[in-house]
Regions:
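A short, flexible loop at the N-terminus of ABC-type nucleotide-binding domains that lies
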Residues: 1-7, 11-23
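Helix-to-loop junction immediately C-terminal to a conserved catalytic motif
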Residues: 52
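Catalytic Walker B motif of ABC-type/P-loop ATPase nucleotide-binding domains
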Residues: 146-150
Length: 227
């Protein structure tokens, strides 16, 4: 099986000279839901943006087996058009026929529990529905690796749980399971992943059992890792 993501000795420094990552290594061994926690400034969000090719590393190597999509903490920052269908159209391949485009949009919406929402105005959606739509955008674009930067930080507990369950289903479906790398500041979410790691000072620790890592961090951080 091809390794979905490999990051080797990745370093990044901001224009003001402040280092964000220092020889960071990461390997996701198989499809699944993988999570990162760490304090503010530990480099988590910077790492995702480097993997998504939004930033240029100073040194190191990134190898992703397939297309990469990034889901932001606030879906309003990436949902750009008025309706659900029109927004998903942005990420589709240009050579698809009209019928194929309609089918791809409908399929992606159904996968995230928004079947029949094609003409629904985005401004009428709840926060959880908007985040599901952002995830549908990743699916519509045929992404193999989905990066999620604190996707539940702005959601109520019910919506948080719904998005978490959705990602678990997408990463463990029998046919073509996704690979997801999820940043979280909620330690309880670590109980629902295939592996979790702690980022500190621009470097990443080894993968651990998520529940065990949450239990180890809870006394230090009051049950909540800083975003």
């Amino acid at each position: 099986m091809t390794t979905p993501l490999t990051v080797e000795r990745l370093s990044f420094t901001w224009p003001n000279g402040r280092p964000a990552l220092s020889h960071c290594n990461l390997q996701i061994p198989r499809p699944g839901l993988w999570m990162l926690v760490g304090t503010n400034g530990s480099g988590k969000s910077t790492l995702l943006r480097l993997i998504a090719d939004l930033l240029e590393p100073r040194s190191g190597r990134i190898s992703a087996a397939g297309k990469v999509a990034l889901v932001f903490q606030n879906p309003d920052h990436q949902l750009l058009l008025p309706s659900c269908a029109s927004d998903l159209q942005l990420g589709l391949q240009a050579d698809l026929s009209d019928d194929e485009r309609r089918s791809r949009v409908a399929e992606s919406l159904a996968q995230v529990g928004l079947g029949g929402f094609e003409e629904r105005p985005i401004h009428t959606l709840s926060g959880g529905q908007k985040q599901r739509l952002a995830i549908a955008g990743a699916l519509a674009s045929d992404a193999d690796l989905v990066l999620l930067d604190e996707p539940t930080a702005l959601l109520d507990p019910d919506s948080q749980n719904g998005v978490l369950q959705l990602l678990w289903q997408l990463t463990h479906q029998p046919a073509a399971p996704l690979t997801a790398l999820w940043i979280t500041h909620r330690l309880e979410e670590l109980q629902h992943c295939d592996g979790a790691a702690l980022m500190e000072h621009g470097s990443m620790g080894s993968w651990q059992n998520g529940q065990q890592l949450a239990q180890r961090l809870a006394p230090l951080q009051g049950g909540r890792a800083e975003g």
